[in-house]
UniProtKB/Swiss-Prot annotation:
UniProt entry tagged with the keyword Acetylation: no
Any one Pfam family match given in the protein's UniProt record, by short name: DHHA1
Catalytic reactions on record: tRNA(Ala) + L-alanine + ATP = L-alanyl-tRNA(Ala) + AMP + diphosphate
Entry's Gene Ontology BP terms: alanyl-tRNA aminoacylation; negative regulation of DNA-templated transcription
Keyword DNA-binding: no
GO MF term (any one): aminoacyl-tRNA deacylase activity
SUPFAM superfamilies (UniProt xref): Class II aaRS and biotin synthetases (SSF55681), Putative anticodon-binding domain of alanyl-tRNA synthetase (AlaRS) (SSF101353), ThrRS/AlaRS common domain (SSF55186), Translation proteins (SSF50447)
Subcellular location: Cytoplasm
Family of the protein in this entry: Belongs to the class-II aminoacyl-tRNA synthetase family.
Top enzyme class: ligase
Cofactor: Zn(2+)
Organism: Psychrobacter sp. (strain PRwf-1)
EC numbers for this chain: 6.1.1.7
Official protein name in the record: Alanine--tRNA ligase
Phylogenetic classification of the source organism: Bacteria, Pseudomonadati, Pseudomonadota, Gammaproteobacteria, Moraxellales
Length: 903
């Protein structure tokens, strides 16, 4: 962070062409010279705020500062914040590429005051930066401002202190159907900090359509909002009354792209230097001329959102943030395809982006290769279904005309089978003036979700139906039992009851409990709750709000509300769960050391039997790396170092390098777990593992006993999973593997160290036999080729060979085609082979004929008819399908189909 004025602040004379990078630097320099602390942009994944999908405003990272929860060592801040608006409440995706100012990614310049200066200084700073010849030097006669209708204080500052004519100050009242609901009144929520705001507008001139703010023509493009200054001065109460805040604050925002467009004398954000360079790069990479196509703007915009999201730890997936990222990538790929891109191209846009923005955001430079790899992998995956999906969509649209609607069933099939996000389908149909039945799509989606829920039902989410206002005090960190706790609630079938009798299944809520509730990946604990009249077996513990929900069965007698009880956790299960939980922390640290800091936790499951850890990584982890990871964890266990738990302020924890799980909600005070030996990095002592965690752990690393990885697999694109055992479970696994190795050695009549070599020898022999079989198949194919050439027919003046061949698989088919081609010139060859219940499809078209018909189209036709898959190049293509009763009819109809294609 920068705390003092820059030694060489950027000077920006008004007649100079300004690069976007210059504007960003000038803004920061200006406010640092006004004693603001330069705070770096926060991640696009909102830290400590699961209510947000993405960071979408400069104030997101300061939310707790405005609420008075987060006390920092500065009261003035300036930022250039990365923002994404795609998915969720704030979604600009559909408009990107078609308007002058919509983006998925943008930068928000902002200055903030936390109980320091207020309206007078905020307005003065904004005006100075915008109009001073030392800074941006905008023509003051082109600026208008809006204020909240009753904000006389802001009016007086603009009119009397700044000298703005009264007719240039526009009052905007409540225009959203409720008191204090206005374009010029900002609120954090239904209750809490809020206040009036004042916006600065720039007049692009009479040649652009549009009216002043507050007029019926305000949606035009003539008057463009440049800067918004929010004055948080009230605290809205639940009854709607406004109480003055003891320390009013300021939150401002100015879009970097918008102000750059004004300074560079262009109307569209896509005409500023940054976008011009990206658009030109997109045209060069795709191999087309830049004719200002909307699709080029889409590609240039989307590479920013995609690259920064991946740099901040988001990877393509089918849910949450990962699915929004996937939608953006696939939209860009489709627009590139529309422009003529035939191969993967989008990942090549990362390099031009790094050139434009790498200086301001070094993380782009550091993670360039990782970003490119992640994008390319998603491109390749989507390419497998893009062409098929587009053909299906084209066939659905053939019978529709402008103004019609594509059925929800068709849109859902494109989504479910071909990976087309519904907004991508809408993007394509909109180009033809056709809408989408979104309600029908949602209905199909709900049906699928219900099927998934029905298939996965094995238990009742009993905590969801129980709402308890009174929080439970957890006392289990240092003890397994607690005497004389109070039963404050009994529930059966989700309803509160006064008594649970023997055999009843139900839920007990206590005022204090030693039972750990499911959280942080660790399962809830088991044990018993005993009163003078009965015993309740606790089978699981969860949370409902701040209350702990103990689910189980009355084993003996009965329990009543308001009774006192003794609560006891099963010791052996607690110890085993603690071992596995601590091992996940050591595993996480080892993964980052071996695979790199880009690895981040995506989920975990910790039970008494095993542990499961999901993490971001693009490839399968090699056996060598797995062995290293396993060794590192066991070295920490062997070191038998004491674990340390400390409560501290969350900012202090982050400063120490503590890892946090994105999406988790943490309070101001957090529990920090430090494990393992201390190492020296960059001259600083750092523990092997340091994480925020509220779970149960061992006292010393040696208590884990032993760590053994049992599997590593992929569960989604870019997400890997490791399963492992600890303690006696790990020992039993190793002993079982040892026994299996001994049995295998006996079967092979070899010594144990010789088993691998003996198996390799057998595998080599099998491969040689398979090669011999393949050579025999090729001989059979060659023999068939000699007879097949006699079956050539003439269709539309072209030589065509259509034939079925027996006992030929896909591997042998290529050799057979080559043999036939050596005997026939300028011929279309279509062969279908059948072997072991599978059909092998192949087509070859002489290069002289590919202008008339393409091999890929032939195979796609056959694959569609026979419910198979396939594709390829214009001169050669292959495919496959299951054996089918349809084959005879398809082959009989094939000459007529070929004729229709050649006519």
């Amino acid at each position: 962070m920068t705390h003092s004025a820059p030694s060489n602040p950027t000077q920006l004379p008004s007649d100079k062409f300004l690069r976007t990078a210059d504007v960003r630097k000038a803004f920061i320099d200006f406010f640092v010279s006004k004693q603001h602390t330069h705070v770096p942009s926060s991640s696009l994944v909102p830290y400590n705020d699961p209510t947000l999908l993405f960071t979408n405003a400069g104030m997101n990272q300061f939310k707790d500062c405005f609420l008075g929860i987060d006390k920092r060592d500065y009261t003035r801040a300036v930022t250039s914040q990365k923002c994404v608006r795609a998915g969720g409440k704030h979604n600009d995706l559909d408009n990107v590429g078609y308007t002058a100012r919509h983006h998925t990614f943008f930068e928000m310049l902002g200055n903030f005051s936390f109980g320091d200066y207020f309206k007078k200084s905020a307005i003065a700073y904004a005006w100075e930066f915008l109009t001073s010849k030392q800074w941006l030097g905008l023509d003051a006669d082109k600026l208008y401002v809006t204020i909240y209708e009753s904000d006389d204080e802001a009016f007086d500052i603009w009119h009397q202190d700044i000298g703005l004519a009264a007719e240039r100050i526009i009052r905007i009242g409540d225009n959203k159907g409720a008191p204090y609901a206005s374009d010029n009144f900002w609120a954090m929520g239904d209750t809490g900090p809020c206040g009036p705001c004042s916006e600065v507008f720039y007049d692009h001139g009479e040649h652009v359509e549009g009216g002043l703010p507050g007029t019926p023509e305000e949606d035009g493009d003539r008057y463009i909002e440049v800067w918004n200054c929010v004055f948080m001065q009230f605290n809205r109460q639940p009854d709607g009354t406004m109480e003055p805040l003891p320390a009013p604050s300021v939150d401002t925002g100015m879009g970097l792209e918008r102000i750059s467009a004004i300074l560079q004398g262009v109307h569209s954000n896509y005409e500023i230097d940054l976008f011009v360079n990206l658009i030109n790069s997109a045209a060069d990479i795709i191999g087309i001329k830049n004719d200002n196509q909307a699709s080029l703007k889409v590609v240039a915009d989307h590479i920013r959102a995609v690259s920064f999201l991946i740099a901040d730890g988001v990877l393509p997936s089918n849910e949450g943030r990962g699915y929004v990222l996937r939608r953006i990538i696939r939209r860009a790929v489709r627009h590139g395809n529309k422009l003529g891109a035939e191969d993967s191209f989008f990942y090549k846009m990362v390099a031009p982006l790094v050139k434009e923005m790498g200086d301001a955001y070094p993380q782009l430079v550091e993670k360039q290769a990782f970003i490119e790899k992640a994008i390319e992998k998603e491109e390749v995956q989507f390419a497998k279904t893009l062409a098929q999906g587009l053909r299906l969509l084209d066939s659905e649209l053939e019978s529709l005309k402008s103004g019609d609607v594509l059925s929800g069933e068709a849109a859902f099939k494109l989504y479910d089978t071909y990976g087309f996000p519904v907004d991508l389908t809408a993007d394509i149909t909109r180009e033809r003036g056709i809408g989408i039945d979104e309600a029908g799509f949602d209905e199909q989606m709900n049906i699928q979700r219900q099927r998934a829920r029905d298939a996965g039902k094995f238990d009742v989410d009993y905590s969801a139906a129980i709402k308890v206002e009174t929080p439970t005090e957890f006392v289990g960190y240092e003890q397994l039992d607690e005497k004389e706790v109070n039963i404050i609630g009994l529930y059966q079938d989700g309803k509160e009851v006064e008594v649970l009798n023997e055999g009843d299944e139900g839920v007990i809520v206590l005022d204090r409990t030693p039972f750990y509730a499911e959280g942080g990946g660790q399962v809830g604990e088991m044990g018993e709750i005993r009163t003078s009249s009965g015993v309740f077996n606790v089978e699981d513990t969860k949370k409902s709000g701040q209350a702990f929900i103990h689910h189980g069965v009355v084993n003996m007698g009965s329990l009543q509300k308001s009774q006192t009880a003794d609560a006891q956790v099963v010791s052996a299960i607690r110890s085993a769960s603690a071992r596995n939980h601590s091992a996940t922390h050591l595993l996480h640290a080892a993964l980052r050391k071996v695979l790199g800091d880009s690895v981040s936790q995506k989920g975990s499951l910790v039970s008494s039997e095993m542990l499961r850890f999901d993490f971001s990584y693009d490839n399968a982890v090699s056996q060598k790396d797995l062995a290293t990871i396993e060794r590192l964890v066991n070295e920490q266990i062997q070191a038998n170092v004491e674990t340390h738990i400390e409560l501290m302020n969350i900012d202090d924890a982050m400063a120490k390098g503590a890892a946090a799980l994105f999406g988790e909600k943490y309070g101001e005070t957090v529990r920090v777990l430090t494990m393992g030996t201390t190492e020296i990095e960059d001259g600083i002592q750092k523990p092997f593992s340091i994480e925020l965690c509220g779970g149960l752990h061992v006292k010393r690393t040696g208590d884990i006993g032993l760590f053994k990885i049992t599997s590593e697999s992929g569960i989604a694109a870019g997400i890997r999973r490791i399963e492992a055992l600890t303690g006696m479970g790990a020992l039993r696994y190793i002993q079982q593997a040892d026994s299996q190795l001994t049995a295998l050695a006996n079967q092979l009549k070899a010594k144990r160290p010789e088993v691998a070599d003996r198996v390799q020898t057998m595998a080599d022999k099998q491969r040689e036999l398979e090669k011999q079989i393949e050579r025999l198949n090729q001989k059979i194919a060659s023999a068939q080729a000699a007879t097949l050439v006699d079956n050539v027919q003439t269709i539309a003046d072209k030589k065509v060979l259509i034939a079925q061949v027996a006992g030929i698989d896909g591997k042998a088919m290529r050799g057979l085609i080559d043999d036939i081609k050596s005997k026939l010139q300028d011929t279309i060859i279509i062969l279908v082979g059948e072997k072991d219940g599978q059909l092998a499809l192949a087509a070859s078209v002489s290069k002289s004929l590919t202008g008339d018909i393409k091999a890929g189209d032939i195979i796609r036709h056959l694959a569609d008819e026979l419910e198979g898959k396939g594709g390829g190049k214009p001169d050669y293509a292959q495919g496959g399908a299951p054996s089918s009763d349809k084959l005879t009819g398809v082959m009989q109809a094939l000459p007529n189909w070929v004729a229709s294609q050649l006519s």
